[in-house]
Structure formats: C-alpha cells, structure tokens
Amino acid sequence: MDRIIAAVVAGVIALAPMAATAQDYGRYSDAAAQTELSRIADVRMAVMVPMRDGVGLATNVYRPKNAPGPLPTVFVRTPYNELANNARTTRTALTWISRGYAFVIQNERGRYFSGGDYQILGYPQTDGYDALTWIAAQPWSNGKVGTLGCSSSAEWQLALAAQNHPAHAAMVPQASGAGIGKVGRFQEQGNWYTGGVPRSLFFVWLYGVDNPLRAQIPVDIDQETRARLVRYNDLDAKKPEVNWPSQIRHLPVDQMLSDLGEPPATFEQLIARTPADPAWRQGGLYHDDMG
C-alpha cells in the first residue's frame, strides 16, 4: 500500500497539465452546462472500448477543442447510469476539460450499454488494465492517466494500482470501503461480510443495482446509432418498491431476493460463499495478496 500511496503523490505532479482559470460549474443550470460543454469540448459518446476477451465497454470521451497537443486523461469507471445526458457527468467533464485534461467515463462490464455480464467492480484486474491501455494508445493521449471516483468507482482503482500499469500516473480513490483480508481473527469481504455476518443493507443496494434482465444492444451497431441510443434511452431497471423493514427479515436469507421475483444473479452467487471462500480473491476486490 505504501507503494500505491507514493505513486499517487508522484503521479499527481507528473499528470498536471497547463494551468487554467477555475470555473464553478455547479452554479450553471443543466442547460447552460450542456451548452458550455458543446462549446469547449469534442464529445464521443458510447465508444465501445474492446477488452481482451472481445467484450466492448461503453465509454464517453470528452476532449478540449483545439488542444495544442496530446493530453493527460482523468478516467472514471462506474456501475451507475452516468453516461446518458447525466448532469453530474457534464459538470465533471467541464471541470477537467477547462483545465486542459481529457475526461473519460466508462460503464463497467454488464452495466447499461456495456457488453458482458455484471460482476461487482467489473473485473478491474483485466478490464481496468485494458481500458488504460486503450486510453494511452489514443492519438490524443500523452500516455498519462489518472483514475478518480468514490465508492465503487474508488474500489476498483486499488486492484488496478497493484498491477503497476505504465500509464497509471495518479489515483484518487474516495471512500473505498471494500477489500478482502484478515482483520484480527476475522475474514473480511468488503461490503458483504463483517466478522462473518452478512451485511443485509448491501442486499438492498444489490436489489436496486443488479439487473440481469437488462436489454443489450447488438454489438455490430454503428457508432452514430449507438450514441443516439445512449442519448435518448434509459436502461435503468424500473423495479417495484419493497417494504425493506419487513423484507430484510425474510428467512431463509438466501431467498430474500428470489421471493421478490428476482431472477438468480449476483446475490445468489455471493450469499452462498463462506467468509473464507477463495472465490472472493478471484474478482475485483483489493486483497492482502495484491501488490
């Protein structure tokens, strides 16, 4: 971990581009922010970035117009619906573009317009690495990528940093609470177990996030059509409201979501694992044996 922290400090210095006058884009209306983004940025929406197994991940790329040369990049990966006309994404892109960075945001595998099947944290040991390789190879990139994000968008950065990708110049993992390892005599599994007891609050989150019945866009669709689909369509699941104070007491626990009509998905995989199951170390969570 000391190596990771040192890389953050050194990378932030190395990544820094030209200075720019700061703007408070939080004061802009949604319409004004979108207008300003159109004025100062070249935008490509839903670019399908290929992973090593051929699966494409939907990615928005924002670059300053008329940039004088290759740019450093700020990169966010997210499981949430932040690519399609998202006001927060627009303001974040403005913040970085106005300072001379490219800004790239990508949906994790199996989320919204990305291909493949969802796994919590989205295969950071392969997908995260491959995404950085793709960014660094673009003609507009100077080969330096800083990763940024909170919660899930922070946790994948730790597993990525342990791989020492040559383009990974800086990282800012905010509120990265999940990891795998031993705390005293207990095995910890990120958000799932604490001292061997499953965290029922995480079940509620998973019900809202996991969507195994999501629509998938044909992989051979052209880029322009895919971008229009992202702009004008919403793949968020519209699930029924649940009385969680009652449902959280459901027994047996492993049928808590199937009792709501949910098809088998991530919950059923994780609830079947014991705290010491070696499968915890095969996913994207940072663990004791990394780096």
Language-model features: locations:
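Cap/lid segment of the alpha/beta-hydrolase catalytic domain
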Residues: 64-136, 186
